[in-house]
């Protein structure tokens, strides 16, 4: 089991790289995260929902994503509450205290999934959540040492040296553990190191002497990895490279407080002709394309946008010929009304949308979870592959001009419409995540948004190359013989 001294220490990436190394060695390996709290999620082959990081780890391992890889997923709906997803299906919304009482039920689901994976795979690589040293969360823990102790799993502790204080993080974490938990930690991995390793060696010697535990490796800081983030937004901006006469498209996405599935924009951030910005505050930069992203709490995030003046920003942008895309929750915001009669994303309410497309959305208790294929309803009809994760039922005249046609996914072999394109062709709305992943679709959408000579980039191939680069680095910098000796 890989645990970390902090959130974003490198647990997900370490598991992904080890999954790829195991695949290279011919082992059948399964990634596993008992409990994940994230708004980036993926649809599995068995029709459920798991954290995006586990889907990436499955790709690294060469296996189809399955709900057993992440049996408990918590999707925050507010600062104190979350939607609880068990074995891929939404069960209920709970506040923190109510979920604490529910944990025994969640732990049963965790143990069921783990037992199935142990029976079906050569190795299970487990990822912890946050830090095992959260004293206030120790009672009833199912994500870190509580799980490791229950199933007798050895632990490797990873820390991010780029944050500073790496030795305090490692030794301090051990100090916060019980004797049995401390003994379970077999050693350490130090992540994101830059500089001369010889200057670090005295610290490594001290760490070994202080703890009696080995350092399995020091991993270098790898720039430019294109890997799906578990939850944290990437750095604020990504500027296009200077390209002489080649065009550049300016894309701005509001960093909504409850933004979901922002991995939709990874292909744009990787595109050499796109100047990409996540906006949080202050004046909105000039843009050719504004994208309203998905949200786990659409009404609250729409109110946040309004408070920031984005309704006026969008209308001015359209008045001067700019383009707008709304994805999932962003699509719902573009309509006339947003109704949540059951309080699925907060208190029951009905609020006006931005009124830019003639449709209305009502949230329903049954969540749509589908992997989809289809074509853009734009010149060229480029192929699209993606997924739907939403609870919205959207209806209205604007849907008569769909943005995509999707395979119906049933025995009929037919197609179904999705989303809408405005009569003036400036607004495109869809429920489909992963809109920019397919190379041809990305190029067509960038051309629609105004980019002359849009290059075709193959983002899935770039992500695959990043996994290979990650595994190569691990093979060079980890003591794999010592690490594999801890596998059971």
Curated annotation (Swiss-Prot):
Query: InterPro entries from the entry?
Result: Class_I_gatase-like, CobQ/CobB/MinD/ParA_Nub-bd_dom, CobQ_GATase1, CobQ_N, CobQ_synth, GATase_3, P-loop_NTPase
Q: Which residues form the active site?
A: 328 (nucleophile), 433
Q: Which Pfam families match?
A: CbiA, GATase_3
Q: Name one GO biological process term.
A: cobalamin biosynthetic process
Q: In which pathway does it act?
A: Cofactor biosynthesis; adenosylcobalamin biosynthesis
Looking at the record's lineage, which domain of life comes first? Bacteria
Whether Methyltransferase counts among this entry's keywords is: no
Q: Where is the GATase cobBQ-type domain?
A: 248-441
Disulphide bonds annotated for this chain are none
Q: List the SUPFAM superfamilies.
A: Class I glutamine amidotransferase-like (SSF52317), P-loop containing nucleoside triphosphate hydrolases (SSF52540)
**Keyword presence, Disulfide bond:** no
Q: Which GO terms describe its molecular function?
A: ABC-type vitamin B12 transporter activity; catalytic activity
TM spans, by residue? none
Under the heading Gene3D superfamilies, the entry gives: 3.40.50.880, P-loop containing nucleotide triphosphate hydrolases (3.40.50.300)
Q: What does this protein do?
A: Catalyzes amidations at positions B, D, E, and G on adenosylcobyrinic A,C-diamide. NH(2) groups are provided by glutamine, and one molecule of ATP is hydrogenolyzed for each amidation.
This chain belongs to the protein called Cobyric acid synthase
